[in-house]
Structures are given as C-alpha cells and as structure tokens.
C-alpha cells in the first residue's frame, strides 16, 4: 500500500467541497495531492477541457502543438524567466525522474541525497528516492540514494563534502511521511551547497 486507504468514497466536488457516496459534505483541504488547487468543477476549467476534448483528446509530443508553445510562453512571462527550457510531462514523478536524470547527465554522478520520510513518485528513479521500502522493487534498489533526516544540516553538509553527489531532492512539505516541513536554515544550506 502506498497510501492509507480511508473509508470514504468521494463521488463529486464543487469549489472547495467534496461529497461522499452517502452525500456527506467535506471541506477539501487535500485537493487530490494538491493537484486540483483551482477547486473542483471550476467553470473555466470545465470549459477549457471540454473545448480541447472536442478538438483532440491526445496526440504524441513528436509533432508540434501550438497549445504547448503558448503555455510555455505564458509560463515564462509569468515566472520572469526570459531564457529557460520547458519539458511538459504528466506527473510529479516524471518531473522528479527527469530532474534527477538531467543532473546525472550534467555531472556524470549517480548518488542522490533524499530526506527520510519523503515521497517522490512511483517511476523507477523517483521510487528509489522515496523512503518507503514497500514500494521499492528489487530493480529499484541500486544504492544510489542516501536518506538523511529532514532538516539535519550537519548530516547534509557532511554528505555533500564527499564530492560524489549527483543531486539533492527535497520534498519541502512532506505529505505521505507526515506533515513535516523543511526549515529555512536547511533549505538555505542546500541552496548554498548546490
């Protein structure tokens, strides 16, 4: 089991509320892993998704897609970055997987530092960087990841000093491992070292 399964079946949502199969109403502070942060059934979201599904539901990224280009331009403008690269993917696991691979391509190293209790996804490398042996298959156990206690700056600095670290991956607000926050001093130490 990746997540604890709660005895509730959510069947519909509107705004910041969801309802279960017995029509009990809940204030949704979870948002499906924070994926639906705009609220459930937002009219603009429904209109845009419906319009796109009436045109084309999916196609490979091996061809040009003006929507991706427009999105990249809008994202770059909103973020204040004029010179950047964007790789559109489907999930956080894929984002983490590709970030770790890019780091390894860049520096040729393989060792990753991750935090105890962290969850980074279920793809091959992301699951290896996830601190949950129950979902880590033998093929994922490559000893490339060193798990350190979150916010243990001394242990982090000691590991970085070895000079063989490819990447550091931090879940700033741990969800699955409990609601644990990376503190400011720790994040500043990570930024300085990296």
Residue ranges: model-predicted function:
Residues 164-179:
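Short acidic, glycine-rich surface-loop motifs adjacent to enzyme active sites
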Residues 73-167:
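PLP-dependent aspartate aminotransferase-fold enzymes
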Residues 20-21:
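Short, acidic, Ser/Thr-enriched surface-loop or helix-capping motifs
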Residues 25-109:
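Glycine-rich loop-to-alpha-helix module at the N-terminal edge of alpha/beta enzyme cores
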Residues 1-14, 74:
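Active-site-adjacent loop/helix segments that line or gate small-molecule/cofactor pockets in enzymes
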Residues 24-25, 179:
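Residue-level signal for well-ordered, solvent-exposed loop/turn and beta-edge residues enriched
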Residues 180-194:
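Catalytic PLP-binding core of fold-type I/II PLP enzymes
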């Amino acid at each position: 089991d990746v997540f604890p399964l709660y005895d509730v079946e959510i069947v519909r949502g509107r705004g910041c509320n969801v309802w279960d199969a017995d029509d009990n109403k809940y204030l949704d502070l979870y948002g499906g892993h924070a994926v639906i942060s705009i609220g459930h059934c937002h009219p603009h979201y429904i209109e845009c998704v419906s319009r796109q599904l009436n045109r084309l539901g999916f196609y490979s990224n091996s061809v040009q897609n003006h929507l991706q280009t427009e999105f990249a331009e809008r994202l770059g403008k909103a973020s204040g970055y004029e010179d950047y690269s964007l790789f559109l993917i489907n999930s956080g696991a894929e984002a983490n997987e590709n970030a770790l691979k890019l780091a390894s391509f860049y520096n040729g190293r393989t060792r990753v530092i991750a935090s105890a209790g962290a969850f980074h996804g279920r793809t091959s490398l992301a699951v290896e960087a996830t601190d949950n042996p129950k979902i880590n298959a033998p093929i994922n156990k490559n000893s490339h990841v060193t798990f350190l206690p979150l916010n243990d700056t001394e242990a982090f600095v000691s590991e970085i000093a070895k000079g063989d670290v490819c990447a550091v991956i931090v879940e700033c607000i741990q969800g699955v491992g409990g609601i644990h926050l990376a503190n400011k001093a720790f994040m500043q130490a990570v930024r300085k070292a990296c």
